[in-house]
């Protein structure tokens, strides 16, 4: 039975039971900001279940398009390497909105599976929530499923209702028990029944889940019976198709085989079992349906997820040898397969192909260079024996060559390498901060204005009255702004400082008799024309109105503290590090100061402390700040510091604060004591020869110090020592750790030797050579290597594969003694085993390594080594 027939039969069956066939909703959730993509059949009925929406039917059935490739539900990294992970899938479902309940839902499911689909009853197993006696009795007494095949699933670790068989929409709201139906693939496949220690195997596969919403959970965790219980069910079309078509992997069903053959045609790959073909076949579905539903590739949100999926598919095509756009040519094959069920896909076919082609061509323009960098880094790592890919390099690939992190991680995973995600995130955060600072309210020079200049009074006062000279909305001049309008106001007089010299623009309020305007930022439209950017909170504003302008005094004061301390810090850095220190950039806002400066080496803790001491000494001196306007020549003669490359006018403003004297047009404290306290919170490099310091002042510095004190006190409490003894105690602990690590290494070496002796007896003779494939409990890669070397010495002429499992990942190592490498290659052997456990690997003829993500298949993979070796000896 083909997938299309299964879909049709499911919908028609429930239609015959009084259900309304409802079209799939869009993959972009409607009015639900909590969801990135539609990921379940019940999403479109969420408000119906919550009682916020009413439908003209009380029973419904759907085949819902779903995507899981971002956020909490993210299957992307597993796609192509397991039998059942997909980015796009179809969820068949039937729903009851206060109509039928457990009896009918269970009866319908059993009738469809056993009578309509013809599944053998003895192949079906069932789970129910441990306390759901009603469902248990229906299954055992009415349906007649033997009690040994109906399994009660309890709460995880005793936490009430924390069970795989109890569904909750959230911490509060509708919830209830569920019953799941499993298909038994037979004893030839490893795995145990649900609830057993081996339940993660592939023998018993869940095909249908029936959720019974019968309670409403309140904030106290109390369950209240719902007056009209409901039913929400879901059955993956791909999973049930695999069962009905008598195949074990979803990728073997007719729907996927069509797309896999199409991908093979376009890439020239002859191996239809290639994981890369599976990736491409899966991803063309997700990408095409997302584009058809209005998502376009971008750099954030849904668009970024789409771009990641497209580029992952392209990378796998590149891996198979494609060097030009190929992915978009699969769209007609997909439309032929799925267009009849989803007319929106057929209607959008041309647009889908066009969007994919453009994205492909854009990425193919850079992928060659990006892959070269990636391969060079991996080769260098292999030489050095490193297993962690540099996060900065991963970010360069992302930023320069368009390689999303998960694409780089995907390539690394194939080599059993992990990416330093923390370093990547740090690089990303730095770039975002730079972009935010550079692009915030960029309205300068892009608004057309002809009129008087703005007179700035913000050095003397925070309040001023001014007349509206111009108004802008959506970048165009207007005569008035209405309540709720976002726009820009130009005044003839203002106390608001416009962003300049690294200091952010002021925020505050413009108030008139007819309306109030909240100023969110202030920027210069022209050199002496100030634009107040914000929103009309109440009433209206019109050109010619007189307004009272008031700056947010607290924000201005915080900004002034941070700006003034930046001058003092600059001076202190030159004293501590040398006269070569020059400002390369700054960003001053109410929260902190960020200062970039020329220097080649990281600051030592002692240098940071010295800078802090110098600045805080200036603060304690409480010296008055003096600002004077003078000619540029007089400023130079006075010794005022000027920034290299900066253009100055004939007249400049010179700020003297403490021992610092610089040209500056910003706002500052009246006395150094107003700064209160200065603390450096971070120091690091941002470019070759450029360092960055971030610092806080005043109340923010006090809060920072208090937080550090709290942390030290917490650590001292954990260590049961006084705060001033923490460092000594940690040093002692580290000494113990190092000693234990050395002892562990010695024990592992002894373990390898002892295991090697035990494993020798397990080797079997095949045509004059010894063949051994075994798993070592608790071993790491180093132990596997050491054990392999010892076994090769002991067995003399041998073919060996050793494996270990840790944190759900498989590590493999293969070895072939030198007398056999003409016939057998360790790289080919380890790759054969790795492919069976969801991985890939390679290496030298005599020794090779690999990794995998599917430990469930490891026993069978190891068992295949003997036959592989026998065929080649």
UniProtKB/Swiss-Prot annotation:
Catalytic reaction(s) noted: tRNA(Ala) + L-alanine + ATP = L-alanyl-tRNA(Ala) + AMP + diphosphate
Class of enzymatic activity (EC top level): ligase
Comment, domains: Consists of three domains; the N-terminal catalytic domain, the editing domain and the C-terminal C-Ala domain. The editing domain removes incorrectly charged amino acids, while the C-Ala domain, along with tRNA(Ala), serves as a bridge to cooperatively bring together the editing and aminoacylation centers thus stimulating deacylation of misacylated tRNAs.
Record's keyword terms, sorted: Aminoacyl-tRNA synthetase, ATP-binding, Cytoplasm, Ligase, Metal-binding, Nucleotide-binding, Protein biosynthesis, RNA-binding, tRNA-binding, Zinc
Lineage summary: Bacteria, Pseudomonadati, Pseudomonadota, Betaproteobacteria, Rhodocyclales
E.C. designation(s): 6.1.1.7
Name of the protein described by the UniProt record: Alanine--tRNA ligase
Function description: Catalyzes the attachment of alanine to tRNA(Ala) in a two-step reaction: alanine is first activated by ATP to form Ala-AMP and then transferred to the acceptor end of tRNA(Ala). Also edits incorrectly charged Ser-tRNA(Ala) and Gly-tRNA(Ala) via its editing domain.
GO molecular function annotation: alanine-tRNA ligase activity; aminoacyl-tRNA deacylase activity; ATP binding; tRNA binding; zinc ion binding
Organism expressing this protein natively: Aromatoleum aromaticum (strain DSM 19018 / LMG 30748 / EbN1) (Azoarcus sp. (strain EbN1))
NCBIfam families membership: alaS
Gene Ontology cellular-component terms listed: cytosol
Cofactor note: Binds 1 zinc ion per subunit.
GO biological process, one term: negative regulation of DNA-templated transcription
Cofactor list: Zn(2+)
One Pfam family hit: tRNA-synt_2c
Compartments where found: Cytoplasm
Residues annotated for Zn(2+) binding in this entry: 563, 567, 664, 668
Source superkingdom: Bacteria
HAMAP family xrefs: Ala_tRNA_synth_B
Protein family: Belongs to the class-II aminoacyl-tRNA synthetase family.
């Amino acid at each position: 039975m083909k997938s299309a027939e299964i879909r049709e039969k499911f919908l028609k069956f429930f239609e015959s039971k009084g259900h309304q066939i409802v079209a799939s909703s869009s993959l972009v959730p409607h009015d639900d900001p909590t969801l990135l993509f539609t990921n379940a059949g019940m999403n479109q009925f969420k408000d119906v279940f919550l009682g916020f929406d009413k439908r003209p039917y009380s029973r419904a059935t759907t085949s819902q398009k779903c995507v899981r490739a971002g956020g909490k539900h993210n299957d992307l990294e597993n796609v192509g390497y397991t039998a059942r992970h997909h980015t796009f899938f179809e969820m068949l479902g039937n729903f009851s909105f206060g109509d039928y309940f457990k009896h009918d839902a269970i009866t319908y499911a059993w009738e469809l599976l056993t009578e309509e689909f013809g599944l053998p009853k003895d192949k079906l197993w069932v789970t129910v929530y441990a306390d759901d006696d009603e469902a248990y009795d229906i299954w055992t007494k009415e349906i007649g499923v033997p009690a040994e095949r109906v399994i009660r699933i309890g709460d995880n670790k005793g936490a009430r209702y924390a069970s795989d068989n109890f569904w909750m929409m959230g911490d509060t709201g509708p919830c209830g028990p569920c019953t799941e139906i499993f298909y038994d693939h037979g004893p030839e496949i490893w795995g145990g029944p649900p609830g057993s220690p081996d339940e993660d195997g592939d023998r018993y596969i869940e095909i249908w889940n029936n959720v019974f919403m019968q309670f409403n959970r309140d904030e106290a965790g109390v369950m209240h019976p719902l007056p009209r219980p409901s039913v929400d069910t879901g059955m993956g079309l791909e999973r049930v198709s695999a069962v009905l078509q008598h195949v074990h992997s979803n990728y073997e069903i007719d729907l996927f085989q069509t797309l896999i053959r199409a991908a093979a045609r376009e890439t020239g790959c002859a191996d239809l079992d290639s994981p890369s073909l599976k990736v491409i076949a899966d991803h063309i579905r997700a990408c095409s349906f997302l584009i058809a539903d209005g998502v376009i590739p971008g750099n954030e949100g849904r668009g970024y997820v789409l771009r990641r999926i497209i580029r992952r598919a392209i990378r796998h095509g590149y891996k198979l040898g494609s060097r030009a756009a190929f992915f978009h040519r699969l769209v007609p094959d997909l439309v032929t397969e799925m267009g009849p069920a989803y007319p929106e896909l057929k209607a959008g076919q041309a647009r889908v192909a066009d969007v994919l082609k453009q994205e492909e061509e854009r990425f193919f323009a850079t992928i060659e260079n990006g892959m070269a960098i990636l391969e060079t880094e991996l080769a260098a790592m292999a030489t050095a024996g490193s297993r962690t890919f540099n996060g900065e390099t991963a970010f360069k690939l992302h930023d320069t060559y368009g390689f999303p992190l998960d694409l780089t991680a995907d390539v690394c995973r194939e080599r059993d390498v992990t990416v330093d995600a923390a370093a990547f995130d740090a690089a990303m955060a730095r770039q975002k901060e730079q972009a935010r600072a550079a692009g915030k309210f960029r309205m300068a020079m892009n608004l057309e204005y002809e009129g008087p200049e703005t007179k700035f009074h913000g050095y003397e006062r925070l309040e001023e009255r001014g007349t509206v000279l111009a108004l802008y909305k959506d970048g165009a001049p207007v005569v008035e702004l209405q309540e709720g309008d976002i726009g820009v106001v130009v005044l003839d007089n203002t106390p608001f400082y416009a962003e300049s010299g690294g200091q952010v623009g002021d925020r505050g309020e413009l108030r008139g008799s007819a309306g109030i305007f909240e100023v969110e930022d202030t920027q210069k439209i022209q050199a002496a024309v100030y634009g107040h950017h914000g929103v009309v909170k109440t009433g209206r504003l019109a050109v010619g109105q007189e307004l009272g302008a008031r700056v947010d005094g607290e924000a201005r004061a915080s900004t002034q503290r941070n700006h003034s301390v930046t001058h003092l810090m600059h001076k202190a850095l030159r004293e501590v590090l040398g006269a070569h220190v020059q400002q390369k950039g700054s960003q001053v806002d109410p929260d902190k100061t960020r200062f970039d400066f020329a220097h080649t080496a990281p600051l030592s803790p002692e240098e940071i402390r010295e800078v802090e001491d110098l600045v805080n000494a200036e603060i304690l001196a409480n010296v008055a700040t003096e600002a004077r306007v003078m000619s540029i020549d007089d400023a130079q003669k006075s010794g005022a510091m000027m920034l290299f490359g900066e253009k100055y006018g004939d007249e400049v403003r010179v700020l003297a604060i403490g021992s610092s004297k610089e040209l500056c047009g910003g706002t500052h404290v009246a006395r150094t004591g107003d700064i209160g306290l200065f603390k450096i919170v971070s120091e690091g490099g941002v470019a070759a020869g450029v360092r960055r310091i971030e610092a806080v002042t005043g109340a923010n510095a006090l809060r920072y110090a208090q937080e550090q004190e709290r942390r030290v006190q917490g650590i001292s409490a954990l260590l049961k020592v006084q705060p001033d003894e923490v460092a000594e105690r940690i040093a002692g602990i580290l000494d113990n750790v190092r000693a234990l690590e050395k002892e562990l290494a010695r024990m592992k070496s002894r373990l390898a030797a002892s295991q090697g002796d035990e494993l020798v007896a397990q080797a079997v003779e095949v045509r004059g050579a010894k063949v051994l494939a075994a798993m070592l409990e608790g071993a790491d890669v180093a132990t596997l290597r050491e054990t392999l070397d010892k076994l090769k010495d002991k067995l003399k002429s041998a073919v060996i594969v050793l494996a270990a499992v840790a944190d759900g990942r498989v590590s493999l190592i293969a070895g072939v003694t030198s007398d056999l490498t003409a016939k057998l290659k360790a790289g080919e052997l380890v790759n054969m085993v790795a492919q069976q456990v969801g991985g890939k690997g390679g290496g030298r003829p005599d020794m090779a390594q690999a990794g995998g993500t599917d430990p469930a298949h490891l026993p069978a993979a190891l068992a295949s080594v003997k036959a592989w070796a026998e065929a080649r000896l």
